[in-house]
Amino acid sequence: MTLTPARRRGHEMLDDPSHDAALAERSLHDVALANRWFGGRRAILREVRQVLARTPAGMTLRLLDIGTGLGDIPAAVQRLAGRDARHVTTIGLELAPALAHVAHGACSHAVAANALALPFATASIDIVTCSQLLHHFEDETAARLLRECTRVARHAVIVGDLRRSWVAVAGLWLSSFALRFHPVSRHDGVVSILRGYTRAELALLIARATGRRAVVRHALGWRITATWFPGFNAT
């Protein structure tokens, strides 16, 4: 028996745009908790740290976090930058105005906008991060998102997502009770994992969408990251 199931779409309850705003916020709390305990935040910070090392020390950077949720990743980036005496202005983006408002306290700025039509000029953002959002889209729409990320990024794009695995499914299901996840979060979390990617799948999706060769790495907690630099083509 393979530990990597076939990729499947399933149905995440909170993908329904008519969902209750309070339930969505509760689910975002569960996502932030999962990011903390299962490595989603650490995986993104690992990549951000390497990008910061490539940029001049005195430079003020702009970071856009797409699908920011509660803004836990921008907040963690600011703490990381502060330890190295770096200054990073963070922008959290959510589709729903109510959720953007929730994220505002954790980011320098919060914006309600469509990730498929980002309201930013080309190459106007130094670092673009996108954590656990890509798997919500069918491949054609996911490619549009990746192209938008590449368009607005000046230095780097960092995508974090889930590695598809039966072990990850079992781990999430069992730990969700101890962490007191809402039942909707538990259901959607399992579906999210089954929508996740292998390293080869994610690299191919990015190359086909953007023409860039991403550095794709596994991370603890059945996570996967992909980082690429808009100025370098996949040649």
Give the positions of each predicted feature.
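N-terminal auxiliary segments of SAM/dcSAM-dependent transferases
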Residues: M1-P17
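Class I SAM-dependent methyltransferase Rossmann-like catalytic core
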Residues: P17, A21-E47, V51-L52
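Class I SAM-dependent methyltransferase SAM/SAH-binding core
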Residues: R62-A117
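A conserved beta-strand element that flanks and buttresses the S-adenosyl-L-methionine
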Residues: T129
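A short, conserved alpha-helix within the catalytic core of class I
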Residues: F137-E148
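Conserved beta-strand signature within the Rossmann-like core of class I S-adenosyl-L-methionine
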Residues: A153-L162
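C-terminal alpha-helical "lid/dimerization" subdomain adjacent to the S-adenosyl-L-methionine
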Residues: L162-A209
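Conserved Class I S-adenosyl-L-methionine
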Residues: R195, R199-T235
